[in-house]
């Protein structure tokens, strides 16, 4: 420390060392006295301290090397700067992370907000759909109740119709009335319907006497072979009977019993089955019977036209006088007016009634012969039925 000297005598190396006052003036031992109370330089009250190794660090720092002190200070300052920088960097790093988290949270909440809006729209649509479905369910329930009520009504109607049809079926099985109006005849024909509990109906023709005559009573083969020699062309009964039998599913060879062909045909037409017939079988049977009667009407019409061409038109006005009535006849007589609406069969029967008694009896006798329908005989040079199967 070459700069230390006595500020009064300027002695640089005193033997007893130096003193430093509280006003930072240095004095040697010679100049400074132990009882020095006033500074010799600035004249202030001072307190003296010996400069030796026991001085305090506060005083010692003034005698240290300034470069070293600066270096130490710089090092300390650098440490302070480093500490502060590291602390600052740590804070900045934390704030940066928080900022990134904030940005991510903003993106997240923005996305969730969009999803929330979408879910809210879907919820509104689902609510509307539920309301519509509830309305449809209520309407469907009403329709179901209505349909059940209609089904119950239909079942009740069906039950009543079934009971009615069952009653009609029982009535038909018990007795089937003859639907044709009967012409007046001299002789009382047998009963039109003869039935019993264990047999089918036996329909008898009103124009044919039953039982039939013996096959040997008349040569009916020669009658058809040379019919014009004995009498005018008669009724085309063969075509009519075979048409009725073929329509009802019967063969011409079936007429081998004692009953006449006309009786067999009427029996097949109007005899219902003793079994319990269903609605479908009844309808089919009615349709078949109607077809048979239509074909029978056509056969009678052909006979009437043939007879009109051969002998002239029959005078219908003489119907009541052409046949004897017979006072004891139990058959009801139906008088037909010329302008009244009648069925084709009734018209044909009225035309057929124009024959005299002898001709009608002859027709009855011929048509009741066994095997009459099995033979194919031409009448007036024409054949009205096909060959027998």
UniProtKB/Swiss-Prot annotation:
It holds the Pfam family zf-RING_5. It is found in: Chromosome. One of its GO terms (biological process) is synaptonemal complex disassembly. Residues 123-164 form a coiled coil. One of its GO terms (cellular component) is synaptonemal complex. The keyword Phosphoprotein does not apply. Disruption phenotype: High levels of embryonic lethality, but a small proportion of the surviving progeny develop beyond the L3 larval stage. Of the surviving progeny, there is a high incidence of males (him phenotype). Impaired meiotic recombination with no chiasma formation between homologous chromosome pairs at diplotene and diakinesis. This is most likely due to an absence of crossover recombination. Disrupted rad-51 localization during meiosis, whereby rad-51-positive foci are present in the gonad similarly to wild-type, however unlike in wild-type, they disappear before the end of pachytene. A zinc finger (RING-type) spans 6-43. Expressed througout the gonad (at protein level). Expressed in the germline. Interacts with zhp-4; the interaction is required for their localization along paired chromosomes and stability, and for the formation of chiasma during meiotic recombination. Recruited co-dependently with zhp-4 to the synaptonemal complex between homologous chromosome pairs to regulate the formation and number of crossover events between homologs during meiotic recombination. In the early stages of pachytene, in complex with zhp-4, recruited by the zhp-1-zhp-2 heterodimer to designated crossover sites along the homolog pair to stabilize other pro-crossover factors such as rmh-1, msh-5 and cosa-1. This in turn facilitates crossover and promotes the formation of chiasma in each meiotic nucleus at the late pachytene stage of meiosis. This is Zip homologous protein 3.
């Amino acid at each position: 420390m070459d700069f230390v000297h006595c500020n009064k005598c300027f002695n640089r190396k005193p033997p007893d060392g130096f003193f430093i006052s509280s006003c930072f003036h240095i004095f040697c031992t010679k100049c400074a006295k132990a009882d020095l109370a006033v500074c010799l330089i600035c004249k202030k009250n001072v307190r003296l301290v010996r400069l030796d190794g026991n001085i305090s660090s506060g005083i010692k720092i003034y005698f240290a090397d300034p470069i070293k002190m600066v270096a130490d200070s710089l090092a300390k300052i650098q440490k302070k700067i480093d500490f502060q920088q590291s602390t600052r960097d740590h804070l900045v790093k934390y704030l940066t992370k928080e900022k990134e988290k904030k940005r991510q949270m903003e993106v997240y909440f923005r996305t969730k907000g969009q999803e929330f809006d979408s879910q809210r729209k879907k919820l509104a649509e689902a609510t509307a759909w539920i309301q519509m479905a509830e309305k449809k369910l209520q309407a469907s329930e009403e329709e179901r109740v209505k349909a059940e009520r209609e089904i119950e009504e239909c079942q009740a109607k069906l039950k009543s119709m079934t009971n009615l049809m069952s009653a009609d079926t029982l009535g038909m099985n018990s007795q089937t009335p003859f639907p044709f109006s009967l012409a007046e005849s001299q002789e009382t024909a047998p009963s039109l319907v003869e039935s019993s509990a264990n047999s089918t109906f036996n329909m008898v023709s009103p124009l044919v006497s039953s039982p039939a005559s013996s096959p040997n009573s008349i040569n009916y083969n020669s009658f058809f072979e040379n019919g014009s020699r004995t009498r005018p062309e008669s009724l085309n009964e063969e075509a009519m009977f075979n048409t009725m039998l073929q329509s009802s599913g019967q063969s011409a060879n079936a007429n081998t019993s004692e009953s006449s062909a006309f009786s067999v045909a009427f029996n097949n037409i109007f005899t219902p089955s003793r079994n319990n017939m269903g609605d479908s079988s009844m309808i089919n049977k009615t349709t078949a019977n109607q077809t048979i009667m239509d074909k029978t009407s056509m056969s009678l019409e052909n006979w009437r036209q043939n007879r009109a061409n051969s002998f002239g038109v029959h005078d219908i006005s003489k119907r009541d006088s052409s046949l004897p009535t017979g006072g004891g006849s139990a058959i009801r007589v139906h008088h037909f007016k010329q302008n009244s609406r009648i069925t084709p069969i009734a018209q044909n029967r009225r035309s057929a009634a124009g024959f005299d008694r002898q001709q009608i009896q002859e027709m009855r006798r011929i048509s009741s012969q066994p095997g009459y329908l099995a033979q194919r005989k031409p009448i007036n040079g024409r054949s009205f039925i096909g060959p027998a199967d």
